Amino acid sequence: MSALKGPILVLLGSLCFSTTGLMQVLAPQGANAVSTAFFRMAVGSICLFIWCFFTGQLRFDWKTLPWKRLIACALCLTEAQVFFFSSVKDVGVAVGTVVYIGVAPCAAAIFAFLLYRKKPSTVWWLSTALAITGVVLMNDLSAGRLGDMSALGFIVAAGFGYALYVTISPVLLERLSAEASIAIISSLVSLALLPAALCMPMQWVLSPMGLFTVFDLGIVTAGLAFTLVLNGLKQTDSTVASTLLLGEPLGAVGWGVLLLGEQIGFIGYCGMTMVFFSIVLLCWEQHRRSKTQDC
């Protein structure tokens, strides 16, 4: 069971991420991508700093922290959010989501090989292809559009940015707890987004639904989600984790059906089944490898 702890934590993190779309739907009129991303990271960092303070996880020398790695992780997340949110409207939500989610595992495999000379297994290639196909079916791209190709390029760049973050962030756990790492990274991302956020309308935050949206995004999809994923990366390869994160659109579809009354057809259910089996396949591979190493 211990071999599955890492993948399970990554999956739980992806389920937390999956509520992002739900909150954007429920957000009051006037909410925009930049200010939403800013408040998400700012609230997440504040909550995590409070948690780390009361649990004694801030007892370290700030001068000796791996600032280069922390800043690199923050830049990756900032780039991913800015590029994705600024371009997704031009290519369509369905196409943008599939490209972003689909690029990340392949990019993670490239970065893992370039940085650590790690090669993904045959099972990983099979499960990743199965999951990406499932995500495509869930989003019903037959009705989609590619839109501006330059915007599509930004979506691809966003996927590479997030994949690089997943690849390089586990090193931080050698010096910091996952909670402290995400608290610092989230604060750096929110500072980077602050200038752009100040140019956007923020009145929507003051409404009851606006406050609920901000706190849910900050606590669940930033503080809790990133912490779960980073803890999971202790025992899970970045390439495997990036594919497990394809559970996010599976969760998003589930929330839409259960809470928003959205309808999906037979093809959509086939896509959900494919993503589910790709996750089961990866977990089985992780368990098999662990038993082989123990022997």
Q: Residue ranges of each PLM-predicted region?
A:
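Helix-helix packing/entry segments at the starts of transmembrane helices
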Residues: L15, F39, G96-V103, I168-S190, ...
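Specific transmembrane alpha-helical segments of multi-pass solute transporters/efflux pumps
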Residues: G21, T55-G96, Y100, L137, ...
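C-terminal transmembrane-helix exit sites in multi-pass transporters
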Residues: W51-T55, A104-L126, L250-Y269
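C-terminal-most transmembrane helix of multi-pass membrane proteins
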Residues: M41, G210, L246-C295
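Hydrophobic/aromatic residues within transmembrane alpha-helices
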Residues: A27, T36, R40, S87, ...
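Hydrophobic transmembrane alpha-helices of multi-pass small-molecule transport proteins
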Residues: L48, P120-D140, L193, W255, ...
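Hydrophobic alpha-helical transmembrane segments of multi-pass integral membrane proteins
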Residues: L4-L9, S35-I50, W124-L130, S150-A157, ...
